[in-house]
């Protein structure tokens, strides 16, 4: 159940929220939507699945569609979330936990950006998701960032901030007061102003 204010172009409710799109699935509790600003805030118990464009179900099932080599997605949870379609970003806030193919990540805030290009010449399914792009371009993690590799939990990275450039496949760790550090499987510690992980 939700309330809709057509005059002010807003909606909101306190019940469970479920949203499904080709690039993003969302479960949560309570929401506020501002259709003029193109934002949706989810108040609590947020769980999301973010797919790369190669894993878009609509593209797979259409005529001539092919299964991707690898189904690329991440799952994440947090206390609350803000979707800003105009800026093509999703922000998870509070007790964020991310599970992806090779590692777990925890942090205070995670911001996921979609690119502004339609890599396939006009991916309508991405446009209908409100992001108008072909996939995740950048991921920022802020506040008590911890990355733990799945294949060896003793390999960890600690930082105040992380920037992941998805197309380039790079992860950069930085610190405010304390340098970020990496702990190898052998227990060796590497620390520096900026670390590429």
Task: Report each predicted region and the residues it spans.
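Mature-chain termini and adjacent capping regions
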Residues: 1-197
């Amino acid at each position: 159940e939700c309330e809709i204010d057509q005059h002010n172009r807003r909606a909101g409710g306190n019940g469970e929220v479920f949203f499904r799109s080709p690039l993003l699935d969302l479960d949560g509790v309570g929401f506020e939507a501002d259709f003029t600003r193109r934002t949706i805030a989810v108040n609590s118990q947020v769980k999301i699945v973010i797919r790369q464009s190669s894993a878009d179900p609509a593209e797979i099932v259409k005529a001539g569609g092919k299964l991707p080599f690898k189904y690329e997605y991440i799952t994440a949870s947090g206390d609350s979330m803000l979707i800003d379609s105009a800026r093509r970003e999703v922000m998870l806030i509070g007790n964020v936990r991310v599970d992806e193919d090779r590692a777990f990540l925890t942090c205070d805030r995670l911001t996921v950006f979609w690119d502004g290009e339609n890599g396939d010449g006009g991916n309508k399914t991405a446009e209908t998701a409100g992001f108008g792009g072909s996939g995740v371009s950048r991921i920022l993690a802020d506040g008590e960032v911890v990355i733990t590799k799945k294949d060896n939990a003793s390999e960890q990275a600690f930082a105040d901030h992380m920037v992941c450039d998805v197309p380039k496949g790079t992860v950069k760790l930085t610190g405010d007061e304390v340098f970020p550090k990496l702990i190898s499987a052998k227990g060796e510690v590497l620390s520096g102003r900026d670390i590429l992980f």
